[in-house]
């Protein structure tokens, strides 16, 4: 299941994407909320969402993915762990040496743009 958090007509929701169509899981499954935080925290909720997405995908209901304005998957993450120099072309472009270990660094909520 591919998930997309975004807004349609100004209303933010979690959508399950299938091809060029998406179904609104926020409306279909109680407790999901308008980002992926609840799905990450509760595996049983994710299972419910997968089941509901399959059910809704069989029906004609849905919205075009092109009509969804993407948003952050988690609207207020406490900390973001980033991976720097994570692909060879990036390393070469920057003139860096390939590291023995990945470069990890953290960002706080305030650094999200």
Regions found by a protein language model. Give the residues of each.
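Structural signature of FAD isoalloxazine-binding scaffolds in flavoprotein oxidoreductases
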Residues: 97-113
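N-terminal non-catalytic cap/leader segment that marks the start of a structured domain
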Residues: 1-102
């Amino acid at each position: 299941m591919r998930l997309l958090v975004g807004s349609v007509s100004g209303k933010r929701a979690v959508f399950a994407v299938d091809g060029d169509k998406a179904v609104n899981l926020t409306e279909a499954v109680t407790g999901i909320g308008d980002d992926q935080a609840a799905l990450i925290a509760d595996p049983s909720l994710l299972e419910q969402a997968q089941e509901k997405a399959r059910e809704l995908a069989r029906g004609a209901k849905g919205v075009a993915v092109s009509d969804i304005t993407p948003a952050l998957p988690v609207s207020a993450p406490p900390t973001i762990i980033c991976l720097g120099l994570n692909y060879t072309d990036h390393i070469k472009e920057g003139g860096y040496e390939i590291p023995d270990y990945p470069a990890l660094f953290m960002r706080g909520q305030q650094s999200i743009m």
